[in-house]
Amino acid sequence: MEQTQNPNNQRRVISLLVDNSNGVLARVASLFCRRGFNIDSLTVSATNDPSISRITVTLRGSEQALSQLILQTERLEVTRQVFELDPEKSLQRELLLLKVACNTAERAEMREIATIYKSKIIDLSPDSMVFELTGRPEKINAFLKMFSGYDILELCRPGITALERGGKHQHMQKPAQEVRDAQLPLPGTHCPQ
């Protein structure tokens, strides 16, 4: 029997360009929380413009709920742009640090798995190994599955970071401020209740 994925629970990756100032991350995360979204992962990074930061958020939800969230996020005065990244038109990467208990006999097997997945061994002790792997979330999941039979001591997956493919930014239509200005009533008119 073929399984279909629930469209209301699809993983979605949102990219935000925001002002690089104090409290911005808290405001954005608070909005997501108030709207009932559970954040699966969140990364924040600098951009080539020191006044702008990039926030990449991974969450689950329906297209309709996400569209509403994007509109509300665009209304924040700290938001420059916000959009969903299409998995087929974006580069999404995740980092994994994995510490596994091992004995001498298990080391060769673990090194073989690391070689196949192009993982790095970044620490080695008499009773453990630490691996570093970067790749698509599906690759990270497959790597972890290979280690499911071993004693995993610790792991860290900080979150997905992503950019659109291609030379030009596909979402550079209007700055978010223009969107907000277009939603404000003209002077002398009243806001609808």
Residues of each region from the PLM?
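Long, contiguous binding/interaction regions
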Residues: M1-S53, T58-Q193
